Amino acid sequence: MSKSHLLKYLLISPNLPVGGFCYSEGMESYLHNKNLIDSNSVKDLIINELKIGQIRLDARLLLDFFDIFDEINEGKNLKGNLHKLMSLDKWILSSKDTLEIREQQIQMAKSLFDLTKEFGFEYLCKNNKKSSWPLAWSWACYCFKITKLEMIENFFYSWSANQLSAALRIIPIGATKAQLIQRDLLAIISKVSKEIMDKEIDDIYFGNVGLAMAQQNHNDLYTKLFRN
C-alpha cells in the first residue's frame, strides 16, 4: 500500500487533522424547527446537501486548485497562476453566507496548512492568513499525491462524517445509527464525486437557501462547535 494511500486516512478522520473539532453548520436550526427528529431525517439532510448543496461547488474547486498547483510546480505562468489561485480562493470564501461559516473555513484551513507544513510541505502563499478549506484540502491532497477522484471522494466523506459527529451531539442519533448512515452514504458519495469530475464550475448547480437561513442563527445557538 502506497504512502499516499495511507495519508488519505489522516485527512478523512473525523478527529484529525483539524484539531479534533467539527462544526454543525446550522444543524441546530433544523433541530429547533423540528426538521431533524431522527436518524432518517439526518441522513436525508446530508444526502440533499451532497446532491444540491454548496458543498458540491467546494468539491469542484478542489480540481481547479489542484491543476493550478500542478502548473506552478512545473514553472508555468507563475504570476498568472498565483493570481488565479488567490482569486478563486477569495471567491469561494466570500460565497459563504455568514461570518461564522467563513471563520470556520479559515480556522480549518489554517489547521490543515499547519499539518502539511509538519510533513515538509509549506504552502506557496504562506503570508495569506485567510484561506478557504477547499484550498487547504486540495493543497494537502496535491502534496500527498492523492488522485483527483479520491480527493473529491475523501472531501465528501470527511464533510459527511463531521456532520454526523455533530448530529450525534445535538439529537442524538447514537453511534451505531451514525455508522449505518455513513455506510449508506458511500454510494451517493461515489456517484456525486464522479459527476463533479465531469463538470465545469459553471455547470455546478446548487441551492442552499435552507442551509443559509439555518446558518443565520449560527451565532445564537449553543452547539456551533464541538471538541472531541
Curated annotation (Swiss-Prot):
- Organism of provenance: Prochlorococcus marinus (strain AS9601)
* GO molecular function terms listed in the Swiss-Prot or TrEMBL record: nickel cation binding
- Record's superkingdom? Bacteria
Q: Any idea what job this protein has?
A: Required for maturation of urease via the functional incorporation of the urease nickel metallocenter.
Q: What is this protein called?
A: Urease accessory protein UreF
Where is it found, in Gene Ontology cellular component terms? cytoplasm
Keyword DNA repair applies: no
| Record key words, sorted | Chaperone, Cytoplasm, Nickel insertion
Compartments annotated for it: namely: Cytoplasm
Name the family the entry cites: Belongs to the UreF family.
